[in-house]
Amino acid sequence: MKATLTFDDKFIVISDLTDIERKQLQLSFTKKIPNWFIIKKKNPFANVDLSFINSSNMIPTGLWMELVNICKKFNFSLTFSSDFNCRIKNCEFNEKIFYDYISDLFKSNEKIKPENYQTKGIYNVLSYKNCCLEVSTSGGKTLMAYMLFKFLYDNSECKHVLYVVPNTNLATQSLDKFLKYDDMNNVDSNYSYSEIHSEAKKKKEYNDNIIFGTYQSLCKKKKEFFEQFDCVFIDECAHAKADSIKNILKKCVNAKYKVGVTGTFPKDGTYENFIIQSYIGPVIFKYSSYELINESHRATPVNVKGILLNYVDIEKKEALRNLRMNVGKDTFELGGKVLSVEKEVARNSQLRFKYICDLASKTTKNTLILFGDIQNGYGRKIYNHLKENTDKSVFYVDGGISNDYRDNAKQSMENDETGNTIIVASIFTFGEGIDISNLHNVILVESTKSDSMVGQIIGRLMRKHESKESAILIDIGDDFRLGNDNKKNNYLYKHFIDRANNYKSRGFNYESYYVNLLETNLF
């Protein structure tokens, strides 16, 4: 078979296929959409498959590496048109010019020097133009983005860069770091910049050299706004499966570089994995948390303690088990409803609540408590108890709290050498991208199943700080198990086990503990 690019470089046309090759490509490039099984239960005739190859044998150019891998796997012959390589890669890119530039940029910086993996990662980006990087949280992704921007701005015609982030904190934090790096490097910030998010000052025109914006705010901009950008950089590109980010990428029609970076890329072969590649490009560089800690020694080792709590009596466990027994029989929504009931039981348990608060109050170092439920006030309840019953400095943060207050909370913890600060925050505000080096403990008090979120939570602890040799993540699980059949394991317990396997697969030291609050007189 032969691969040729369309005139606009958006698609690969695959020709000269045998019937066997065509059928296999159709199978390999067809993925089930998220939650397909729920849709199928609701409507057995629903189409839950999405094909990334059309009837004309065309695939998005970003999936070129998947095409190569499929052909290798099934021993298919594959040739490319003569111009293919230099249209997906930057064949004119000069390696020496890049490495000399980076060396010169940081020559007077006595505090920060790029690691080899950071320089290599950006070298690969400049070589491939449309691609993704998977670099562990705390791996210095913002510094890598800075290196990319500075090189393009000073050495190419790319003068307008769009920097897309998932929340307002990251927009402001990223800009502040860019300016800080300039100051450390003793170079002028000779470029214009702006922020676009819910708390940023509005401007009549945005024609800056670099714009830091949240995808929630950027998606409201008109098509013409995006035509100015030569490069678009998606921070935490695991979110790129969201329609808002896909629309942003579609509108950046003149972007010569489309780059995505994340700490946890979706699993190989999944719909989420393919959709990100189709809009941005393949993962061309990886650097794991294990490598970050054990090879480059740029991150703090994290010890994970999984604490499974038993606090529900037999009668309530039987009621929960009966609910689980009916899942799949009545309505497809029942599984979600049972999970909601389990979460409500966990939130309403006074034994569980006291255990968590006592655990937090006894910590001797700065601690972040992460919760998921805002509507029912679980995090606020923990905050109020700690505020009233401890002598620690306690802060509360959720999506409704102002940026100024959040920054004050972060700075208070960063400056606290006594280790006497606790921040109680929602997972979606402080679970991702927040940079606090002087953080020693994280307590996860509400369940999450997301692989990428687990990676982000661990990353909060991996920042290096002179006061810590290691950090601790305490993961709270809930045991409502009863019986010996396949319905014995409750949903929150399953999530707890999934997270445990996730920690282990990432190479973190994991220890599990079982605490029976019905028998233990803790208070």
Per-region residue spans from a language model:
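Conserved helicase ATPase core of P-loop NTP-dependent helicases/translocases
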Residues: 198-204, 381, 393-430
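Conserved SF2 helicase motif VI
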Residues: 265-266, 449-473
